Structure formats: C-alpha cells, structure tokens
UniProtKB/Swiss-Prot annotation:
Any GO MF annotation of the entry: aspartate 1-decarboxylase activity
Oligomer and partners: Heterooctamer of four alpha and four beta subunits.
Modified-residue entries (Pyruvic acid (Ser)), positions: S25
Major localisation: cytoplasm
Record protein name field: Aspartate 1-decarboxylase
EC number from the UniProt entry: 4.1.1.11
Cofactor note: Binds 1 pyruvoyl group covalently per subunit.
C-alpha cells in the first residue's frame, strides 16, 4: 500500500508580489526551494492563512536571496501582498518507507528568511 505523506513545507511564507498577467504558477526564492527540497515545476499545495483559500499550482524559481513569494496568473486572485501562506508538497511512500519518512519543514520569518529548518 502507498501512503501520501508530507514531503516538504514552507511555513508562513509571506506573499511579496502578485502578477495577474504572468502565465501561472508561484515564484519562490531559489534558496527556499533548495532548503525545503521543493523542485522547480513540482506540484505544490498552497494554503492561505489569512483568507482560508486553498489551491494547487507548481513552483518556479525566483531570484536567490530575494525572499520572493509571488502569486502568478489566476493564483494572484488567491491572496494579497502580506498574506501568510503554507506551501506543501507530498510524496508517496510504501509501507516499508513510511515509518522512516521525515518531511523537510522550513519555518520562515515575515521577510521570508529562514527562521528554522526542522527535519
């Protein structure tokens, strides 16, 4: 049997920009992608803490060190600059893998710098 487990999480990312006319996705600072293990173009689940919106899209790389968390395209309607997001990916684990599985959790400061990495 396969179990869908949390693979990675960026906790309390702050929306830094939104571009309704961009062709979709969520731009994330490359440093945050690397710290969390989220890969470019990977499906991500996004939960807006401020308004309760929940949606899925894919991650694209933003400039390293920029703190970029930018809603693009239709996703730009799902939040406002300053809103807090929880960005999550999931992975399938077998019965043999599930007990040893540990997600990468990156806790963020309001300026999208890394506060703590929990593994």
């Amino acid at each position: 049997m396969l179990h869908q487990m949390m693979k990675a999480k960026l906790h309390r990312a702050t929306i830094s920009a939104a571009d309704l006319n961009y062709e979709g996705s969520l731009t994330i600072d490359t440093d945050l992608l690397k710290a969390s293990g989220i890969r470019p173009y990977e499906r991500i689940y996004v939960y807006n803490v401020n308004n309760g919106e929940r949606f899925e899209t894919y991650a694209i790389e933003g400039e390293a060190g920029s703190g970029a968390i930018q809603l693009n395209g239709a996703a730009a309607r799902k939040g406002m600059i300053g809103d807090f997001l929880i960005i999550v990916t999931y992975a399938l684990c077998s019965d043999d893998e599930v007990d040893e599985h540990r997600p990468n959790v990156v806790l963020l400061n309001p300026d999208n710098t890394i506060k703590e990495i929990v593994k």
